[in-house]
Amino acid sequence: KGFDVMYDKLTLQPYFIHGPDPSVKPKTAKTLEYAFNDYQTTKLMIISHPDDELIFGGVELIKHGPEYKVICLTNNSNNIRKSEFKSVMEKLNIGSWEMLNYEDTLHPTQKFNLQDIITYKNWDKIVTHNPIGEYGHPQHKLAFDAVKKETNNFYVFSKSNEKLEQDYLDYKVELLRLYKSEQPVINQIKTKNGSWFKSNSDTNYIEYESIT
């Protein structure tokens, strides 16, 4: 994929002498894997669950999909959700994507470790959940905390005062239908009628998505 790999004579760690960013020197097997898979991606989106990328950042990915690496922190062992996520990534022509296998829970006991993926190269843009977890989800808050631990230079999901342009909204809704297993939750987010939904806003993230 356009790289020549050399090895540091003292540490035996691999690094690249040719490529878009020759200053990148992966220090672990994982960052070496990232460097090979992600040399064309310049933007990073980190989400807690499959469908978060569409609900909160769908239009961003519709516009800039090939530039993004998308990291989903949970559900790698859930074959249904993994398959749905893969379908969405392919439809959006995402440059690179990965699912990790942290537990999907409303009562998390394990923090996310994102040091490798955030720090191995200089991302043009990093996007993740906001500090209140959008509607209060604990794992969304943890994702924000994990990103903030590694960098202060990032964007978060937010809501615009204006509804999305209709063409983008129509395509976003079409893509959301690929998450068949999550339709009840997606509908609750749109109508804000779930007992777990912590929001006094008249708007919802699906129709009023923004990144700030």
Predicted regions and their residues:
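Active-site beta-strand->loop->alpha-helix modules in alpha/beta enzyme cores, enriched
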Residues: K1-N152
